[in-house]
């Protein structure tokens, strides 16, 4: 397979400095960006430019490419003939290192619980950027620490089910009386009820709080692309009384200039 000449794609000599590489990429990416260029093959050229910069703009990959003609450590091509992975469709999410790829996991329940739309500048879309945003998430109540009660003594055994979380109901039918188990409606199956509810969360155990989330926008992002950022969404209680945070899904709108 013919190796791509990334220096030629960016219009550079092999002794080009990092600043020269960045400057050439900035110019060509703006020229061929699909949201700007009217050329018929602009998208393919943009992908080539993006691919070239992803190698030459990274010191480690550039070193491998200069020595072996390939950016990967093992000497095999990391790109192949299919273009730059992750940018084949405006609607696809990308960069699996940020979490599951959205849109390709139709049978799975999404691991994110916050959707955020964000408008970024054109040059941030072309070159990438580090951003911090403020989001509202659900977390344990800061007053009762997730108990939902004024004190530990106010969390008592459910009087309806006796702490079992289930009740037995009996229904008369033409076949006779039928007994069945169902989730206790008083405690929702938890086996406990709250005598005096927390004044801050009103027994809900959770509150909405504002927190900051910092993430990297990959260079070359296009209109409508999404990025899944793990560990920045709502706090989710686990069965062992621990907590984990779900993801947020960022969808980008790029300013045209």
UniProtKB/Swiss-Prot annotation:
Protein location: Cytoplasm
Binding site for Zn(2+) 1: 141, 144, 198, 201
Keyword line: Chaperone, Cytoplasm, DNA replication, Metal-binding, Repeat, Stress response, Zinc, Zinc-finger
Keyword Nuclease appears in the UniProt entry: no
Keyword Zinc-finger: yes
Cofactor(s) listed in the protein's UniProt record: Zn(2+)
A Gene Ontology term for the protein's cellular component: cytoplasm
Main subcellular location: cytoplasm
The CXXCXGXG motif repeat ranges on this chain: 141-148, 158-165, 184-191, 198-205
Domain J intervals: 5-69
Zinc finger (CR-type): 128-210
Domain of life of the organism encoding this protein: Bacteria
Binding site for Zn(2+) 2: 158, 161, 184, 187
A GO molecular-function annotation: zinc ion binding
Coiled-coil residues: none
Covalent S-S links between cysteines: none
Any one biological process term the GO annotation gives: DNA replication
Cofactor comment: Binds 2 Zn(2+) ions per monomer.
Quaternary structure and partners: Homodimer.
Domain-level remarks: The J domain is necessary and sufficient to stimulate DnaK ATPase activity. Zinc center 1 plays an important role in the autonomous, DnaK-independent chaperone activity of DnaJ. Zinc center 2 is essential for interaction with DnaK and for DnaJ activity.
Family membership: Belongs to the DnaJ family.
The name this protein goes by in its record: Chaperone protein DnaJ
Organism per entry: Onion yellows phytoplasma (strain OY-M)
Gene from which this protein is expressed: dnaJ
């Amino acid at each position: 397979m013919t190796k791509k000449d990334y220096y030629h794609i960016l219009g550079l000599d092999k002794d080009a400095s990092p600043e020269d590489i960045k400057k050439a990429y900035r110019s060509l990416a703006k020229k061929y960006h699909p949201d700007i260029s009217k050329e018929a093959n602009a998208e393919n050229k943009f992908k080539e430019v993006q691919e070239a910069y992803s190698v030459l703009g990274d010191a480690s990959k550039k070193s491998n490419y200069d020595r072996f003609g390939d950016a990967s450590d093992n000497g095999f091509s990391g790109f192949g003939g299919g273009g730059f992975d992750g940018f084949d469709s405006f609607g696809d999410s990308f960069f699996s290192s940020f979490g599951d790829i959205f849109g390709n996991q139709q049978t799975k329940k999404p691991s994110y619980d916050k959707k955020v739309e964000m408008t970024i500048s054109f040059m941030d879309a072309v070159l990438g950027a580090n951003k911090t945003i403020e989001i509202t998430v659900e977390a344990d109540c800061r007053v009762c620490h997730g108990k939902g009660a004024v004190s530990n003594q106010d969390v008592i055994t459910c009087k309806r089910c006796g702490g079992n979380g289930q009740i037995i109901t009996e229904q008369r039918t033409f076949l006779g009386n039928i007994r069945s188990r169902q989730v206790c409606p008083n405690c929702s199956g938890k086996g406990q009820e709250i005598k005096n509810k927390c004044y801050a969360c009103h027994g809900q155990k959770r509150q909405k709080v504002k927190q900051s989330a910092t993430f990297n926008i990959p260079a070359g992002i296009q209109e409508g692309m999404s990025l899944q950022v793990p560990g920045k969404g709502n706090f989710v209680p686990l069965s062992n009384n621990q907590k984990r945070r779900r993801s947020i899904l960022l969808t980008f709108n790029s300013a045209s200039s």
